[in-house]
Amino acid sequence: MKTNLRYLFFILICILLTSCTRYIKPEKFDLDPQLLKSLKSNVPIQVLVPKNAETKYLIEYSGWRPMLGKIYIDLNDLYHNAKELIEEVLVKNKVPLSTNSPKYLKFTISKVQWEHWGGGFSIGAYLEFDIETGDGYKRHYRVQDQSSQNVDRAVGGTTSRAVEQIFQDEKIITYIESN
């Protein structure tokens, strides 16, 4: 009996020490059209995101109590979603896209975090990113989103919030509309 208890105790310790590791795939969500400013341009622009980004990026837990589990994401998935959403806004506003245009918007992620909200009934996620234009303008943003379901949805939603933030920036709108 004591031997069985020792084995059980040993197994429990191993489980607690290794904790849980999850790899998530962020979803892509629609943008809120009321938050997007209209723009107009006939000058081609390209959207740049890092290629071959980190495939096993640890999403930092920013809550007050330590978490045993770790959540990882492939940053290429977030970049893919962000690029698609930015290009969708440009195309919807009839701004031509070109992969070799000197005019560009460059989107770079600097940090992804998550935490429990509302006593654990909701999950919040934060995305810090930089947006840079071809004329040298650069701005750092931190956006957030939440989900009552899971981290995947909360992190995926931050990409939509980031793109909405980009297209509210007057300097970016002016740059896109300039010749």
Model-derived segments and spans:
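Sec-dependent bacterial lipoprotein signal peptides
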Residues: 1-20
